[in-house]
């Protein structure tokens, strides 16, 4: 078989079985939207939880589609994940297993700290950094523009390392001005 440079690229990933239905959506609506917007085809193997994204048009749009699928797999609502089709938006997935010993309750504790009482901590970080955060399985994931994600990740790392919530809030409130200035400079350049 010839190796043609124009050959369509296929990206594969494993998605938790319970999230496959969300990727498909009601009457296939989510899958169809991702395929159309991402100029790709999506094949889902429900037995193995494998998802294949085949580039059909613009390779950057197909990569964005793969990030959308990954985000939905990491617990994001599809409407939130669609923001990854926006230029300069990214998904960062932080695995919590790296900071917790196997078999410990540390992951559960960290997830509780990130979410906060009735979702308060997550909401405050999202509001102050203009990002979206999902806590799912053994991961914490963030969607936002490059600048915003940087600040959200810093705040999350502070929480994960054991800093008090109020310390993280105070840090973020101090950094909000820096964040706005960085975004302004990014938009001007």
Put a short name on every predicted segment.
Residues 1-189:
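RNA-contacting regions in translation and RNA-metabolism proteins
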